[in-house]
Amino acid sequence: MGIEFKNVSYTYQAGTPFEGRALFDVNLKIEDASYTAFIGHTGSGKSTIMQLLNGLHIPTKGEVIVDDFSIKAGDKNKEIKFIRQKVGLVFQFPESQLFEETVLKDVAFGPQNFGISQIEAERLAEEKLRLVGISEDLFDKNPFELSGGQMRRVAIAGILAMEPKVLVLDEPTAGLDPKGRKELMTLFKNLHKKGMTIVLVTHLMDDVADYADYVYVLEAGKVTLSGQPKQIFQEVELLESKQLGVPKITKFAQRLSHKGLNLPSLPITINEFVEAIKHG
């Protein structure tokens, strides 16, 4: 399910003394079954784009096309409910959205809200809980009795239970230890392998290099750079001038190249670096 922004602008609290422009004539495409990353500082427009993808915001100007459905300024139609079902949005610290008395009920709530029967919603909930690594003995527990990592998995299972075609992730591993971070990123990688479109908002450039196949760089509400991660991370000085940085291995390789190591291009993953050394 592809997504396209056509000349999209967004203004918060338009027509009030507090209005602020968040996006300026943004044009971009997110291809079906792609893994697209957005990087940029706070205030660059990343969160606004996330909420436009899901129909939580309506463009002030321009058009957001999700599959065959379009959202334009002033739209208040039934298509937005369809879009919210098909584009799952996982906010930073999604465990803060848990509220039901049991894990199973919490995950089943979303599908039921979209008209799925209780029996089918619970079946979906059980399936998605297993998918994210929550064992059956936890299904009837209060979600607030779980560890932080388990709570986050339950919250993500709640999004997956609505069977979205696109999963939008806002700093999904924030606050997790390295093991928990790796497990969660592997889960998203496996979902992508099964055909789900993944949209990742992150400040971790190593994750962009390891998982994404396309990157948008945002600054002050505009797309300033876009391309494949390999292409984007060759622009070390440009990214550092924006205080965004590059993957650790890319910076290390750049230092070696300045000391005389001959590299055809800067590697962006450890595997690439190893191959470059072997054949260098």
UniProtKB/Swiss-Prot annotation:
GO cellular component, one term: ATP-binding cassette (ABC) transporter complex
Pfam family, one: ABC_tran
Family matches, as InterPro entries: AAA+_ATPase, ABC_transporter-like_ATP-bd, ABC_transporter-like_CS, ABC_transpr_CbiO/EcfA_su, ECF_ABC_transporter_ATP-bd, EcfA2, P-loop_NTPase
Entry's EC annotation: 7.-.-.-
CDD domains for this protein: ABC_cobalt_CbiO_domain1 (cd03225)
Domain ABC transporter: 3-245
Enzyme class, spelled out: translocase
Location(s) in or outside the cell: Cell membrane
Keywords: ATP-binding, Cell membrane, Membrane, Nucleotide-binding, Translocase, Transport
UniProt-annotated binding residues for ATP: G40, H41, T42, G43, S44, G45, K46, S47
Membrane topology label: Peripheral membrane protein
Keyword S-adenosyl-L-methionine: no
GO molecular function terms listed in the Swiss-Prot or TrEMBL record: ATP binding; ATP hydrolysis activity; ATPase-coupled transmembrane transporter activity
Recorded superkingdom: Bacteria
PANTHER family associated with the record: ENERGY-COUPLING FACTOR TRANSPORTER ATP-BINDING PROTEIN ECFA2, HEAVY METAL TRANSPORTER
Subunit annotation: Forms a stable energy-coupling factor (ECF) transporter complex composed of 2 membrane-embedded substrate-binding proteins (S component), 2 ATP-binding proteins (A component) and 2 transmembrane proteins (T component).
UniProt similarity note: Belongs to the ABC transporter superfamily. Energy-coupling factor EcfA family.
Function text: ATP-binding (A) component of a common energy-coupling factor (ECF) ABC-transporter complex. Unlike classic ABC transporters this ECF transporter provides the energy necessary to transport a number of different substrates.
Name the UniProt record assigns to this protein: Energy-coupling factor transporter ATP-binding protein EcfA2
Origin species: Streptococcus agalactiae serotype V (strain ATCC BAA-611 / 2603 V/R)
